[in-house]
Regions:
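C-terminal helical subdomain
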Residues: 172, 191-231
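Conserved mid-core segment of classical short-chain dehydrogenase/reductases
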Residues: 60, 81-98, 141
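Residue(s) in the substrate-gating loop at a strand-loop-helix junction
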Residues: 132
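N-terminal Rossmann NAD(P)H-binding glycine-rich loop of SDR-like oxidoreductase domains
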Residues: 11, 15-20
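Conserved Rossmann-fold SDR core element
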Residues: 153, 163-178, 215-223
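Catalytic Tyr-X3-Lys loop
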Residues: 90-109, 128, 152
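Active-site helix of classical SDR
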Residues: 112, 148
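Alpha-helical segment proximal to the catalytic Tyr-Lys
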Residues: 117, 160-162
Length: 231
């Protein structure tokens, strides 16, 4: 049985680091989905340009390349989503909630829906969504973002229950602050950068989940920060 990997958002700040790790693992074929082509190359890599995946027709188009097969187990990791924050509820524009539900929840819903249809006709598979720490532990000034990410967790946990019937496992990672250039600028000089989780480390977590996709399902993997252990 072959194992094929799909990465959505492969060329973003998180996705690029994760992809660099995963392309070195033993997947028979890897599909990289992003709005911009990734520079990573390999004989087993196929790059697929995507549009706005909150649009159902764009999701259908993205998955049109992937063909179901009883000889293939499919794994999908998505980094797609958006962020807004910094305002109390009474100062928050309703459009901010709409945007977060579109970019975080609706996109995840549609990816899960159409990926499940492929897995249903294949040997099995696993999907791993990117949620957020604040989707579990509320923080001030992040209601639209937190609500949307909390909903992604509910989506994954319910899909894990339903997925038993089609040999599909579903999980989420919930990182706190990821070590990206944008987050470093936002945190400023007072931040302990050694505590920030590196995209490449998340890549290893993703691979571990997919290595054990038959037994790990319905799980939220909380990533609160790195332990500051000297190498």
């Amino acid at each position: 049985m072959e194992k094929h990997l799909l990465i959505f958002g492969s060329n973003g700040a998180l996705g690029n680091g994760v992809t660099e790790v995963l392309v070195k693992k033993d997947y028979n074929r890897i599909y990289l989905f992003d709005a911009k082509p990734n520079e990573i190359k390999g004989n087993n890599i196929e790059k697929i340009l995507i549009g706005n995946l909150a649009d159902e027709s764009e999701v259908i188009k993205a998955f049109s390349t992937i063909k179901p097969s009883k000889e293939i187990a499919y794994c999908l990791f998505t980094t797609l989503g958006g962020y807004t924050g910094g305002k109390k509820l009474w100062d928050t524009d309703t459009n901010d909630l709409t945007k977060m539900l579109e970019s975080n929840l609706k996109t995840s819903f549609l990816l899960g829906k159409y990926f499940a249809r492929i897995v249903k006709e294949s040997a099995g598979g696993s999907i791993l969504f990117t949620a957020a720490y604040t989707g579990i532990f509320p923080e001030k000034g992040k209601i639209p973002y937190g609500v949307s990410k909390s909903s992604v967790i509910y989506l994954a946990e319910t899909l894990a229950l339903e997925g038993v019937d089609i040999n599909l496992s579903a999980n989420t990672i919930a990182p706190y602050i990821i070590d990206t250039p944008a987050n470093r600028e936002w945190m400023g000089n007072d931040c302990d950068y050694e505590r920030l989780i590196k995209p490449e480390e998340i890549g290893e977590v993703v691979h571990s989940v997919f290595l054990n996709f038959r037994i790990i399902s319905g799980t939220v993997i909380k990533l609160p920060g790195r332990l500051n252990i000297r190498q």
